[in-house]
Regions:
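Cytosolic regulatory regions of ion transport systems
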Residues: 1-136
Length: 136
């Protein structure tokens, strides 16, 4: 499968690396080229894996291969950027599977009503901690 990931922070880099190691075609789009150092060197060296650009800008999304993407993942630190990029991927570029990171779990239902898969690290971490507390 072909994945386009916007954001190469800790979450984006981890997701991108895992998918790449599974043999998927992965392109990571980030405004800061220094963030690509979170990726393994052999992954960074592969042609077309990293691209400096803004995932909310249509031209940069096109350069990154949005038209051929099976999945778009928005994992920027800012919810507003993730929401904008994810909506463009889903509704303008017709990407079938769009996953959007949201820091504020109260917005999750709204994003899901827009047809996006919304993932909240805050919610996920809280659930893991509660699970650990209750299993003690």
């Amino acid at each position: 499968m072909k994945f386009l990931i916007m954001g190469c922070g800790r979450i984006g880099a981890t997701v991108a690396t895992s998918l790449w190691e599974e043999g998927h075609q992965v392109t990571v789009l980030d405004v800061d080229p220094d963030n690509f150092f979170r990726l393994p060197s052999d992954m960074r060296d592969e042609q077309g894996v990293t691209l400096v650009g803004d995932g909310t800008v249509s031209e940069d999304m096109i350069r990154a291969g949005i038209h051929g993407a099976d999945v778009f993942v928005a994992v920027d630190l800012r919810d507003s950027r993730n929401a904008l990029a994810a909506q463009k991927a889903k509704h303008i570029f017709q990407v079938s599977r769009v996953v959007c990171r949201i820091g504020d779990p109260t917005r999750q239902k709204m994003y899901e009503e827009l047809g996006l898969v919304a993932v909240s690290p805050t919610d996920a971490t809280s659930q893991m901690i509660l699970g650990a507390v209750h299993s003690s």
